[in-house]
């Protein structure tokens, strides 16, 4: 019955099986945009993840740590769209790149992919479309007001995105209402409708030319449920499509069910309507007829999509099942016919979807229309018949036989026209249509239909078309893939290029050489291309022959092109062809050869031969590349004017240093002027290789300083050899290249400066700039000044300091002063320098020579020019100090000198001037050292107070001899003089940091206790307190009485921290801070009695609260509660409840809690009061409390009472909050089982059902236990534990009764049926098979099979193995357990096993247990077993007679082992006739071995068979001897004839003569006539007188000889006639390729055998041979 269902239903995947949490199975977390991927937002272990499951490969699960509000995946690609609040992002997961992002200004409440590139997004007010490739979202339309307050569940568009539907649902009047907004993009209008689900579809109703676009709507309204199919966007060329509306059925129990989706099956033209509760409705789109309805999911469905691969739908339910539903193409048509009784629908669907099942209807309809003469309708029926059942040759013949009425189109043409309108023709139809079209010479019609893909291209069609149009036939052959006909057509058309391509693609090999020879004469270029393609497709072709073909026509270019492509792999075996290619081109086209060699395409040619040809052709460069001998190279290389310089330089890289040196010398020696430039370039490049010194010597040897200069100039900038640079400078001087000398001296870092300096001095150049540069760079300033001054070149000294390096002016001045130059000259030189002169160095140089005043004019000029160089002011300060020219004013007013330098300069001269300089510069360290050394403590104290630097104070207050006098000045002078609080505070901090409390107290008392500007300073008072607390606690109480500006809280806290509790208490008490005072009493002094007295004294609530907390901490709970009551303070209720509960003070606690309830409404307070009532057993007060208003956590209190086994109180609690689950458990403990079951039914909780059920089982309340159990067995995870509970207590009948009662449950699952089967196996095996037959499809086969194995239920085990398709196990059980064996079943099972070894195990089993059934088993296994192995098995056990029929059945396979065993069995049975048939028909056996065995057989016929075998295997002698032995002379004569050997035939003839059997003599003459020599026959006949027996032979021989002579005579005459004609004809020259002369094959050649026999017959008879 299951096979007759019109749908296919399967579970694609369990989301839980791929590790997704069940809590994630919902509309908000799961999206299903297509049948390719499921996308889930999961949260395992609190980690947000996005899980993508590939539905085509469920093991391919992709997890990404992504946090988002919503995720949708592209329908086809791994492109993911994420929404986090208003942030939208799209990522390509495979490319790992962001595609687009956007921030919305409204919240997106729903979104979905409406196409491959567009996401539809719905906000609270509008609908947007977002093209993710890069643009921003575009608003499409506004939401209709009817959708306000609804949850959007669907947004869809039609195929061209012109119509859209937006659906929202909401709760209204105790039902789920659906609202739909239909929007037209073209008209920009919306229409509101009441609907829950919708889908667009395109159909083509019967009789309508164009497609119709429809919209399917499903709704459930209070008045009824409807499915409507309406037309949208009507085509004006179509008739109007009538709206179809039908009732949508919902079962009575599905009160709250409603449609959630509609999916379209376009192939079948059906709509799948899915409801929330898992019902599927299948409707025909054209008629809106319901085809099928059923429930496919026990859990509610929340998302669906189209399952395109099967034209169905895919859905996901709350259990995480991914379900697939689709039409079953095999059963849908029979179902419609049998169940719906709607032939019209069946025919229409079968035609549209090409389905089986309606064939008879089509045939009946066709024959009926033909009989009525309605040929056009009959043609339509045939054209639309499913699977082409009516498009056959018989139907065509039927139409052809019908005569056309006058003036009407012939029926056969109507038929073909209908077929062409419907689609492409099949092969037979195409042929039948082509014949009349070609006969009318209207081939253009065929070409038109071919272009429209309406024809079925076959070889037969091509053969029909070829006589009319060869190019069109070529297309047909190509489409039909007929290679030989394609090659033929391409050859006829001359399209050899396409021919080569085609043959290469098709892997066929035509006669290429002939094709090439023809093509060379017609199109040489195309021939070259063809030859290349021919070689590429067949590399073994003879290349020499192809080259010869090209060269025979002197096609050098084409031959070259072919060889270049053919030899591109540069194989060694093609060396001769490489040489030939280069020879051809060097002779005919040297430039081509040059290009070939330049591209280095070949490496295996004869280098010597090609090099010589290159030299002759003027290709000097190529010749050099190929020559290896030095003599050849020297001969050619001197012609550098013919060579590319760059190439020549690279060419030298292949030589050793000595060879390079030799070739360069040869080039200079041969023609120095011509080759000098290239030699210099080569020498430059290979300088490191050959050695610069050798090259320098070479140029010097040839006395070419020009070459030396240019060579060294090219390497001087990169060399590290000082000698090379020196030689270059020397050569440049000789070549008068002074600019280059200057550049090298300025920029080069390699040369020896001393050596170059001496060279330049000796050269006495007119321009001393190079010398100046060398001396400046290497600090030879003194030498330079001395040289220039002594040689009266003072102008170059001026040039040096003015233009070259003004920074060296100090050294120049120093050198001039050292040689006693006139000071005026030096001052003038200084005044002439306009560059930046380092004044500090200049001052140092002059000061070292005690000539500082010399600089005064220069320095003052710099000062007047506005220079602010510090060195100038330093120098002026020193001059003013030494000259005592008002230095104090200068030091105080000037801000540009270096205070450190000047102060250091003044320290020994005048400390006060040094202090001024240091103070101006803030040089703290120097001032400290200066004042300490000179006892200037008063100045230092004032300076420190002014500086207000804590670090500086830390430094001076370090323990030293200077600290005490400094502090005295600070306390006595500096601080009293100061009015800056910040400065004083820094001093105080400094004293604190260095821990000088006595001095600090002394300082503070002076400025705080005594009248001063700091007396009222709170910070200083605080500091005084702090210092006293740390250093002298006895003064603290005195300060409390004297001071009043200090920070009370801070000082009190510090006093407490330092143990001065009484002082702290006094501070708080004086300042009326009673709460803090109480805190000191209870926490620090720890005197609760004093605290009690103090609280009674002050009578303040906060004081009582503080006291109560202390009493509570001291576990004086009644006192604490009393204090809290006096304070009227419930704030600390949590701690009071905890401690009072722990101490069991519930009576006191009740008073406190009642006070607290009057002040606040806290759940903890009310809960604690309930607990207190429970603990004091005040159930009446508790019940009153529960009836009244309260905020207690009743469940938690009830749980606590339950845990403490106070079940009566717990019962009250749970009853008040209707907590049926816990109430049921409580009633169990109270023994009220019926009430417990009633509560469990209300709770409907698995845990409760388990608890109540367990209690009922323990109390043997099996009726109640069954009620509980029925609610548990529907949960697979609870079932094993429940069964184990019954089994452990021995209640087997009861558990089986429970399970049987659950068989009718709607939610019965696989585990349920499986466990019931196991129970039957254990306790009621007699009912096991019945259960298996009914429910085998809903069992866990593996578990039930294990149970059957354990309980030895072998028949049941076999049944399960078969239905589980575990045929191997089923067969094994049947062989191992006799009671499970059934021959017929075993035959059906064994043919399906996967383990082939079971075949042979079964054969052995049958051989041992059921030998008479072996033949039947072998018949079933024949196609599957290894026949030689079977034969070996039975041969080994000597049971081959049992399988005789098997061997006969398979002998046609001609297997050696089978033939051998069969023949042995026939010999054993002495059945020679069957043996003869076997040997004649099947030759795969060891014939010689069988013959040797048979020739010794006792029966004559077997020996005759042995002779036959010998004859068949060409053992002629052995066969004849065996035949002679048994006197089978006829067999012997036949053997001699078959041997075709004269010796064997003559020996047998002699044997017959010897034994006197003349009849056999005559017989052999006739039979072996062609083997016997005539002379021998005549001799034997004459000697033995056997002429009468031999005369027939002689007569025939003479006749044959006469015929041969006549033929020879005729042949001779014909030859003479031909020879005469040839002599008279003109001579034809030899062919291009030098073809040799071939002999004409005349009649003589056809009679060689007769001619040979004639020659053998000519000599005289040879007597004496007999």
Curated annotation (Swiss-Prot):
Residues modified as Phosphothreonine: 392
A GO cellular-component term linked to this record: clathrin coat of coated pit
Ranges where the record places region WD40-like repeat 5: 195-255
Residues modified to Phosphoserine: 393
Signal sequence, start to end: none
Topology relative to the membrane: Peripheral membrane protein
CHCR repeats: 534-680, 683-825, 830-969, 975-1120, 1124-1265, 1270-1415, 1418-1561
Chain intervals for the UniProt region annotation (WD40-like repeat 4): 149-194
Presence of keyword Protein transport: no
UniProt-annotated location(s): Cytoplasmic vesicle membrane; Membrane, Coated pit
An example Gene Ontology molecular-function term: structural molecule activity
Domain notes: The C-terminal third of the heavy chains forms the hub of the triskelion. This region contains the trimerization domain and the light-chain binding domain involved in the assembly of the clathrin lattice.
Recorded family membership: Belongs to the clathrin heavy chain family.
Name under which the protein is recorded: Probable clathrin heavy chain
Species whose genome carries this gene: Schizosaccharomyces pombe (strain 972 / ATCC 24843)
Gene: chc1
